[in-house]
Regions:
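Secretory targeting signatures
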Residues: 1-22
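Catalytic cores of phosphodiester-bond hydrolases, prominently lipid phosphodiesterases
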Residues: 21-335
Length: 335
């Protein structure tokens, strides 16, 4: 009888405790995609050339899944070159060819495999930068058909990244007149509804971006967001790599609800060689949502590398996150 009573008492205590926890959770402010701050990598695929090279090329990244698993990277940047055989290859340029994933398919598949095994991760931000081959002859200069290249990229995203694991402009717009109005009036999707997914962003401006907008007016039906211009109907995600000089502008965008990518360093600019964290600290303080680096982990001979303060590995955004945000609420894959 004692055992039965004790068991009943314990059960009652657990029930009351669970009720209390549930009530506390209900009182918490719901977290959204723009309430986070993550580490990103610049040219995430990059491997330094073998042999002597210039400083700008002299850095290497681990495979994308290792970056996600061991270094806490949640934002990636992939340069894509179109090949006449129809393949989309990934490398920096013809003088800097080495890559830890050779094709866009391989890069996406590597990240997707990790994502499927860690489905509570915050959304990946995957920036795709199309590169333009210019073929020269004595008579003319021919630029590869950009529209076809963009469509090839779009189709590979469709083929190699499932729709139910993709956050698209249509998902964010959700009936609003424009994408920009959806963000400023309704906000980004809830973080808990967005875990295990990815957002793709076209890292380009000018004619290339215009061509994409012509194909997908207002980004209706598109898989990718575009690098925005302030005030445009497509405005959602911005890239500003100068958090020192443009800190006020970045912070204003963050406060308005937009997502901003920035940079902590650039190999040839000397931050890593001089262990200079000024740019990193500026990017953190103005609320950049992703902070891209060439050095996401310690490297022999260099004292500099990037960590997001209080990140688990992802942190609460210091500008946009609600006061009751904690790193554990943002992401805790180890639990």
């Amino acid at each position: 009888m004692v055992l039965i009573i004790t068991a009943g008492s314990i059960s009652g205590c657990l029930s009351q405790s669970e009720e209390k926890i549930s009530d506390e959770e209900e009182d918490l402010t719901p977290l959204r995609i723009n309430h986070i701050q993550v580490k990103g990598t610049h040219n995430s695929y990059h491997l330094a050339p073998i042999g002597p090279t210039i400083r700008a090329y002299d850095y290497s990244h681990d495979p994308l899944d290792i970056q996600a698993e061991e270094q806490g990277v949640r934002q990636f940047e992939i340069d894509v070159w179109w090949d006449a055989r129809g393949q989309l290859y990934v490398y920096h340029n013809q003088y800097d060819l080495r890559s830890n994933c050779i094709t866009l398919e391989e890069c996406l598949t590597t990240l997707l495999d990790w994502s499927n095994q860690n489905q509570e991760h915050v959304p990946f931000m995957i920036w795709i930068e199309p590169k333009e081959w210019i073929e020269q002859s004595t008579d003319n200069t021919v630029v590869i058909d950009l529209q076809n290249m963009l469509e090839n990229i779009e189709q590979e995203i469709i083929q190699y990244w499932p729709r139910n694991k993709t956050i698209t402009p249509d998902d964010v717009r959700d009936g609003s007149e424009t994408l920009s109005k959806a963000i400023t009036e309704n906000g980004w999707p809830l973080l808990d509804d967005s875990r295990g997914k990815a957002m793709f962003i076209l890292l380009s401006s000018g004619d290339l971006r215009q061509s994409y907008h012509e194909k997908y007016p207002g980004l209706n039906g598109s898989r990718m967001f575009t690098m925005s211009e302030p005030g445009s109907s497509e405005a959602a995600i911005f890239s500003d790599t100068d958090p020192i000089g443009n800190g006020d502008e970045i912070e204003a965008l963050v406060r308005d609800g937009f997502i901003v990518r920035s940079r902590a360093d650039n190999a040839e600019d000397g931050e890593a060689d001089n262990n200079d964290t000024t740019r990193l600290e500026a990017a953190i303080s103005v609320g950049a949502h992703s902070i891209s680096t060439d050095y996401p982990e310690e490297v022999d001979g260099i004292e500099y590398w990037v960590e997001i303060p209080e990140g688990n590995p992802v942190a609460c955004n210091p500008i946009s996150a609600p006061i009751d945000c904690t790193p554990e609420r943002v992401e805790s894959l180890s639990e």
